Amino acid sequence: MSKKYIIGIDGGSQSTKVVMYDLEGNVVCEGKGLLQPMHTPDADTAEHPDDDLWASLCFAGHDLMSQFAGNKEDIVGIGLGSIRCCRALLKADGTPAAPLISWQDARVTRPYEHTNPDVAYVTSFSGYLTHRLTGEFKDNIANYFGQWPVDYKSWAWSEDAAVMDKFNIPRHMLFDVQMPGTVLGHITPQAALATHFPAGLPVVCTTSDKPVEALGAGLLDDETAVISLGTYIALMMNGKALPKDPVAYWPIMSSIPQTLLYEGYGIRKGMWTVSWLRDMLGESLIQDARAQDLSPEDLLNKKASCVPPGCNGLMTVLDWLTNPWEPYKRGIMIGFDSSMDYAWIYRSILESVALTLKNNYDNMCNEMNHFAKHVIITGGGSNSDLFMQIFADVFNLPARRNAINGCASLGAAINTAVGLGLYPDYATAVDNMVRVKDIFIPIESNAKRYDAMNKGIFKDLTKHTDVILKKSYEVMHGELGNVDSIQSWSNA
């Protein structure tokens, strides 16, 4: 029997990645299509220009298939994963009626407002891509996180008229929805021509980008926390029943049908802040790295490894993109002295990511009355040994890195493998397709320093800075009482 292959699509904020796997979870080839910079005319607007989402998928698909030297008939399916908390407003024919709305746009924190008569459907990014790939008006229910009329008990659209009225999207404007691991449709000849994916290939549901990443990381037990390092940095653990009015976390649908994850508060513009610093350093960093035969990222990690844990008190508040209900918050770096250079800033950002997530994790676990025994770190940031050690030290737990750290596409492949019957269940698929690369053990002296730095210092920093930021916001923008936004776990 010939070897079989699965394609996993990972739609993100800055690019679309398409990866082909064999059934043992090995990467065969991969393609990538960059997204254009978002249209951000003001602090509340973030839109994808043109038909950028589809164009990036087509580019990534062509890139992938141009590298594949095998028999296309051995490719058995495609798992579609795309970013959550976004909106696609479509005409009756499924084409965009307006620019696609990013999760960074303030409008997605509020119920839909029907102001454009051309809009026939309101859907997620995965819904839009499903239609472009298959011609179907279908989507996976698990990508409807936020301002959508979802019944979390039935995993379906709500049948409660009051709920439908609250979110202001009539049923006829919503796509039909189905469970993760089910077939949405098949690649049309037109989509095959545009993407170079084989026509007729089944397209399988996953969920939203973060839960499918948790599946690709191998999150199946109750003793593990997953930290997903992306533009938005997420914190997830396995869930049981729907919680009643949680404060420090919220339930989300996982990539396994009828199974929940619990998600703690994350960091908006998380790894973006690392890229921001790298790009600000510009040509100087590139030239320094080239002289040492290193990438810019490797040079940053090399130099930051020489900075003492705790950065001598240099701390970063990671509020480069705030929640709409807290518009006064701003990114802050505090604690400089004249001896510090960019390596200190870089390490401070890494440490502050870990410390922020540790505090959010503690709040979540204290409320659940359950703590993890180890953490899995996913995303490109986990390539840094320094960052991995910082996570181990700050959490004072073993921090694991997998052989495949871009786990969203692998999770999509796992959904496809189970959905098409190539594995009998998710436990078997994960056991065969997910492999641990290495584990970082906490260094006791570092863990003690981070704990002392956090308690009463970093943990309470924004209690002091928020007072000043609120005053400066009102000088620049007027009274905070005029802010029109909604706060709840369903749109955090």
UniProtKB/Swiss-Prot annotation:
<comment type="similarity">
    <text>Belongs to the FGGY kinase family.</text>
</comment>
<dbReference type="InterPro" id="IPR050406">
    <property type="entry name" value="FGGY_Carb_Kinase"/>
</dbReference>
<dbReference type="Pfam" id="PF02782">
    <property type="entry name" value="FGGY_C"/>
</dbReference>
<dbReference type="Pfam" id="PF00370">
    <property type="entry name" value="FGGY_N"/>
</dbReference>
<keyword id="KW-0808">Transferase</keyword>
<dbReference type="GO" id="GO:0005975">
    <property type="term" value="P:carbohydrate metabolic process"/>
</dbReference>
<dbReference type="InterPro" id="IPR000577">
    <property type="entry name" value="Carb_kinase_FGGY"/>
</dbReference>
<dbReference type="InterPro" id="IPR043129">
    <property type="entry name" value="ATPase_NBD"/>
</dbReference>
<dbReference type="GO" id="GO:0016301">
    <property type="term" value="F:kinase activity"/>
</dbReference>
<protein>
    <recommendedName>
        <fullName>Uncharacterized sugar kinase YgcE</fullName>
        <ecNumber>2.7.1.-</ecNumber>
    </recommendedName>
</protein>
<dbReference type="InterPro" id="IPR018485">
    <property type="entry name" value="FGGY_C"/>
</dbReference>
<dbReference type="InterPro" id="IPR018484">
    <property type="entry name" value="FGGY_N"/>
</dbReference>
<keyword id="KW-0418">Kinase</keyword>
